[in-house]
Design a protein with these regions (language model features):
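Juxtacatalytic substrate-recognition/specificity segment
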Residues: 36-151, 168, 244-251
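Acidic/His/Gly-enriched intrinsically disordered linker/tail segments
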Residues: 100-125, 148-278
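N-terminal low-structure segments adjacent to metalloprotease catalytic domains
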Residues: 1-42, 257-278
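Proteins with a high burden of low-complexity, intrinsically disordered sequence enriched in S/T/G/P/A and R
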Residues: 1-13, 17, 26, 49, ...
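Short, flexible segments with low predicted structural confidence
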Residues: 20, 30, 130-131, 206, ...
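Charge-dense, low-complexity intrinsically disordered segments
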Residues: 14-18, 52-60, 212, 254-257
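Generic beta-strand hydrophobic packing signal
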Residues: 3, 86-88, 198
Length: 278
């Protein structure tokens, strides 16, 4: 195998990369010194993609997942674009995913799906599990530039909403996924915490002992907003008006024209109607 270098043309006129071509060349040359020739390397307006899948598989993911996600994000949500390159590793199997995560970043306590390291501008994706986590992490990669202060509950709610999604006509839509049973279990066992408590969590608490439930709760709150056609409005108004004292509760009550208690009651009734066919 040899390195294949190609530039994927952006399919959208909605976004323009601020990143200089020379930065891509430098990033690719640096990457070549760290990985072997089982990888192909390609460039996208914001990413350098290193993949040990077949060139055809890599191109399909680049076109059908990465490029389409970018189109949807800028049509539906984001205005500001990244000013730095993120490297996306696409791994064909669990073995090579774990090997290179350890070799390159000394990471060994891994999600089986993949993960994003914002501080190092890199994503490592185990594509054998599907592309859902790729879209999740892409959401984070763009949100951190468009809405730098985004709180964890909303950042992870939005990202996890798109773990199972459609990308059609520059619109992204999330569907029921594997996180639903955890939320329904909490409701049935009277362990459910209110939306008001969820949106008041600081980031450390969100990612703490109850993170699996917090992710599920945030995901389905975002899906609930999506189903009521207010998610995009909430994102933009919350982003534009955000400061450290911003109260998501006020924004939710405004877009639903209901009290937070009424929203919670409607949300719980809706969640109970959902089914996950896992």
């Amino acid at each position: 195998n040899s390195f294949a270098e190609n530039t994927t043309k952006p399919v959208s006129t909605l976004y323009v990369s601020k990143i200089d071509t020379s930065d891509f060349v430098s990033k690719i040359n640096d990457l070549k010194t760290k990985i072997d020739k089982s990888f192909t390397i390609s460039a996208n307006p914001y990413f350098v993609i290193a993949s040990n899948l077949t060139p055809q598989e890599t191109q399909e993911i680049t076109d059908n997942t990465i490029a389409k996600s970018i189109d949807c994000f800028y049509n539906d949500y984001f205005e500001k674009s990244p000013d730095e390159i993120t490297v996306i590793f696409l791994f064909k199997d669990d073995e090579t995913y774990r090997y290179w995560a350890k070799k390159l970043y000394n990471d060994d306590d891994l999600s089986r799906f993949g993960y994003y390291k914002p501080s190092q501008h890199v994503m490592l994706m185990n594509i054998s599990t599907g592309t859902g986590t790729l879209v999740h992490e892409l959401t984070h990669a763009f949100a951190r530039f468009d809405f730098p202060e985004i709180p964890a509950w909303f950042n992870e709610g939005l990202g996890s909403l798109y773990e199972r999604c459609s990308l059609n006509n520059k619109n992204i839509k999330g569907y029921v996924n594997w996180r639903l049973p955890r939320l329904q279990e909490a409701i049935s066992k009277k362990e459910y915490k209110s939306i008001e408590k969820l949106i008041a969590l600081d980031d450390d608490t969100f990612y703490g002992a109850d993170s699996d439930l917090n992710y599920a709760h945030a995901r389905y709150l975002c899906m609930f907003m999506q189903e009521h056609n207010v998610l995009k409005t909430f994102y933009k108004s919350y982003r534009d008006g955000y400061n450290k004292n911003s109260d998501a509760k006020t924004y939710l009550e405004t877009i639903f024209a209901k009290s937070i208690g009424e929203i919670d009651s409607d949300f719980l009734s809706w969640v109970k109607t959902l089914r996950y066919e896992g």
